[in-house]
């Protein structure tokens, strides 16, 4: 029996049998601030979620966002501030590549539980799905890392956290939630990383029906956390984006609008 633990019922959930160690484990480590990322320390005054629309350096990495290297043996996704449809956004291009971009923050999700973002994808590989390691590509992911009480970790999860800290020198987030665009998994599906229960995925877009236009999302991260993990969320320590196509070796391109938290749905 596979130790992968799908949290979705039905035929699609029953087919989830393969592990996805490298990509997701690296994302987990990356959000923990892994020293192997070889990136500069955070800029001063960057303890907030910087908006892409406020950036002035077209063609460069947005201020307060840092590269999140997923695998040193594969190409990295290219991220830059760009203009698209009359707005200043983050443009991502992956040609068989994988890497993310993250912004370190310190926020209480109970004060501002609503996470808002927009993204645009013009094409989706319908083979790609976070359910299988050999197909684990996604044109867009928005990732949130949470603090928490490590004394509540199961022995298995504690061992995983200790391994991450031993390898990286940094403490892993207590919980990592990824909002993903999947090629075929149903929306609102939830998946759990097999090696720890503290990394989970929530599918917010699926298939190609909504490609070619800007899509807007508003998610209550407190409610999503309760649904996905159970319990109450701790402080938010990082937000990241990820466009990758390293498993299927395809071209993937996306545009991310501002990512912001607020205390209301509107």
Give residue spans per PLM region:
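Secreted extracellular polysaccharide-interacting domains
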Residues: 92-111, 124-127, 196-204
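Extracellular beta-strand ligand-recognition surfaces/modules
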Residues: 139-142, 197-207, 211-249
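Extracellular beta-strand elements of beta-rich domains used
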Residues: 52, 239, 259-261
């Amino acid at each position: 029996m596979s130790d992968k633990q799908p949290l979705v019922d039905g035929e699609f959930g029953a087919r989830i049998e393969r592990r996805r160690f490298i990509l997701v484990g690296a994302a987990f480590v990356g959000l923990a601030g892994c020293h192997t990322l070889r990136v500069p320390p955070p800029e001063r005054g960057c303890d907030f979620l910087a908006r892409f629309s406020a950036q002035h350096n077209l063609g460069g990495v947005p201020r307060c966002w840092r590269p999140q290297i997923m695998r040193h043996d594969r190409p990295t996704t290219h991220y830059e501030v760009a203009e698209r449809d009359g707005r200043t956004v983050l443009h991502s291009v992956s040609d068989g590549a994988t890497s993310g971009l993250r912004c370190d923050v310190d926020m209480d999700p109970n004060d501002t539980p609503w996470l808002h973002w927009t993204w645009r994808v013009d094409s989706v590989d319908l083979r790609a799905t976070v359910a299988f390691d050999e197909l684990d590509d996604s044109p867009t992911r928005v990732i949130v890392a949470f603090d928490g009480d490590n004394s509540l970790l199961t022995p298995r999860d504690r061992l995983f956290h200790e391994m991450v800290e031993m390898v990286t020198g940094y403490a892993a987030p207590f919980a990592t939630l990824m909002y993903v665009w999947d090629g075929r998994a149903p929306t609102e599906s939830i998946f759990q990383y097999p090696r720890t229960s503290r990394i989970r995925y929530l599918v917010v877009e699926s298939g190609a029906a909504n490609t070619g236009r800007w899509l807007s999302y508003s998610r209550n991260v407190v409610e999503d956390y309760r649904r996905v993990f159970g319990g109450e969320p701790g402080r938010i320590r990082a937000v990241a984006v990820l466009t990758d196509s390293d498993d299927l070796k395809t071209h993937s391109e996306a545009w991310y609008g501002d990512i912001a938290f607020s205390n209301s749905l509107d």
